From Swiss-Prot:
The gene is GTF2H2. One of its GO terms (biological process) is regulation of transcription by RNA polymerase II. It comes from the Eukaryota. This is General transcription factor IIH subunit 2. It comes from Arabidopsis thaliana. Keywords: DNA damage, DNA repair, Metal-binding, Nucleus, Transcription, Transcription regulation, Zinc, Zinc-finger. The lineage of its organism: Eukaryota, Viridiplantae, Streptophyta, Embryophyta, Tracheophyta. Component of the general transcription and DNA repair factor IIH (TFIIH) core complex, which is involved in general and transcription-coupled nucleotide excision repair (NER) of damaged DNA and, when complexed to CAK, in RNA transcription by RNA polymerase II. In NER, TFIIH acts by opening DNA around the lesion to allow the excision of the damaged oligonucleotide and its replacement by a new DNA fragment. In transcription, TFIIH has an essential role in transcription initiation. It is found in: Nucleus.
Length: 421
């Protein structure tokens, strides 16, 4: 009997081992739940759940400090008019499931978020999409300023097939970007899944061609570091990085949303002719010059040739005039004069006196900065006006508002000050 029990126990252990080997690493994470990884020890030795908002804010501030350090010292001229092609590797390597549920799904998800963020920060810029399948590069969308058009085209072509060809992708985007105006900054962002590239010719010649045409090529890898990708970025002045997980991939993508420093040849001041079209009347009917279709209502009319276009910003296909709106120029202005990062306030009891002088609440949203047990809540302070802000307002000010409410409240009209005197 004892021998039979031992045999049955051994058989059960072997079955458990086989079941564990049959599931993937990411599936095992769901099975085991790993709930202990979501706990952390506080200053009193007690276990409590991890504060995801604090982690997000720490990541945000690291990115902010990095951008601020790059712009420290002399003021750097930024390329506000950008022409960016996003190249997405949809070869068979994109079907790998080390990123759950697959590399292809994760790339599509974060490229969608990146497109929206890109147009929010760069309203005067344009994006185009290129995919790589079966060793061939395909143009999903031409350069344009409509995020919905790009996202719709991307989500309709999700399929991982064949090998990847980096050279074919570079040749295609070089052909497209070689036609953009000289004042625009030509950029390529490649999301590469494969560990090799199957090219029809010498890719080194293609890289030199991109370098001569002033294409700034950046690569984000999803597998491992490749020499050819690193060489491409070094030659063209781009950035090369490899994502280790989904969160890291998102951070790497968002680093490309703010405009990069302008190339010295393009930093020379010159005038750019632009048109500010009027929105067409709701009931009017006209042929759209960009889609070659009859459309009723929505659209804009070129002030020079009276052609109809759908979205702004864009270039008139009839007369070649750059068409923008005044809010686009206003939203691009903050990149030239970015607001300095706020200083973090350490949570010490000695700071309570200073907080009482300037108030116990956030200057932005009026939320209390004194938590339970009369403990100070983590906050930041502006270097100029010395007002305190909560973490949420800190993110909102630097990502959306681009002005410090405390500093803006100090400046008063001269007429008011003269009346008081």
């Amino acid at each position: 009997m004892s021998n039979q029990r031992k045999r049955s126990n051994d058989e059960r252990e072997e079955e458990d081992d086989e079941d564990a080997e049959g599931i993937g690493e990411w599936e095992r994470a769901y099975v085991d739940d790993r709930s202990w990884e979501e706990l952390q020890e506080d200053e009193s030795g007690l276990l409590r759940p991890i504060d995801n908002s604090a982690i997000y804010h720490a990541q945000y501030r690291r990115r902010l400090r990095m951008l601020s350090a790059a712009a420290a010292g002399t003021r750097i001229q930024k390329g506000l008019i950008r022409y960016l092609y996003i190249v997405i590797d949809f070869s068979r390597a994109a079907a790998e499931m080390d990123f759950r549920p697959s590399r292809m799904a994760i790339m599509a998800k974060h490229v969608e978020a990146f497109i929206r963020e890109f147009f929010d920060q760069n309203p005067l810029s344009q994006i185009g999409l290129v995919s790589i399948k079966n060793g061939v590069a395909h143009t999903l969308t031409d350069l344009g300023g409509s995020p919905e058009t790009h996202i719709k085209a991307l989500m309709g072509k999700l399929e991982a097939l064949g090998d990847s060809s980096l050279q074919n992708a570079l040749e295609l985007v070089h052909e497209h970007l070689n036609q953009v105006p000289s004042y625009g900054h030509r950029e390529v962002l490649i999301l590469y899944s494969a560990l090799c590239t199957c090219d029809p010719g010498d890719i080194m010649e293609t890289i030199q061609k991109c370098k001569k045409s002033k294409l700034r090529c950046s690569v984000i890898g999803l597998s491992a570091e490749m020499f050819i990708c690193k060489h491409l970025c070094q030659e063209t002045g781009g950035l090369y990085s490899v994502a280790v997980d989904e969160v890291h991939l998102k951070d790497l993508l968002l680093e490309h949303a703010p405009p990069p420093p302008a190339i010295a040849e393009f930093a020379i001041a010159n005038l750019i002719k632009m048109g500010f079209p009027q929105r067409a009347a709701e009931g009017s009917m006209a042929i759209c010059s960009c889609h070659k279709e009859v459309k009723i209502g929505a659209g804009y009319m070129c002030p020079r040739c009276k052609a109809r276009v759908c979205d702004l910003p864009t270039e008139c296909t009839i007369c070649g005039l750059t068409l923008v709106s005044s809010p686009h120029l206003a939203r691009s202005y903050h990149h030239l004069f970015p607001i300095a990062p706020f200083d973090e306030v350490p949570a010490l009891s000695s700071l309570n006196d200073n907080r009482r002088k300037l108030g116990k609440s956030c200057f932005g949203c009026q939320q209390s900065l004194i938590g339970a047990g009369n403990k100070p809540v983590p906050c930041v302070t502006c270097r100029k006006c010395k007002h305190y802000f909560c973490l949420d307002c800190d993110i909102y000010i630097h990502e959306s508002l681009h002005n410090c409410p405390g500093c803006e409240s100090i400046h008063r009209p001269k007429s008011v000050s003269l009346m008081e005197e």
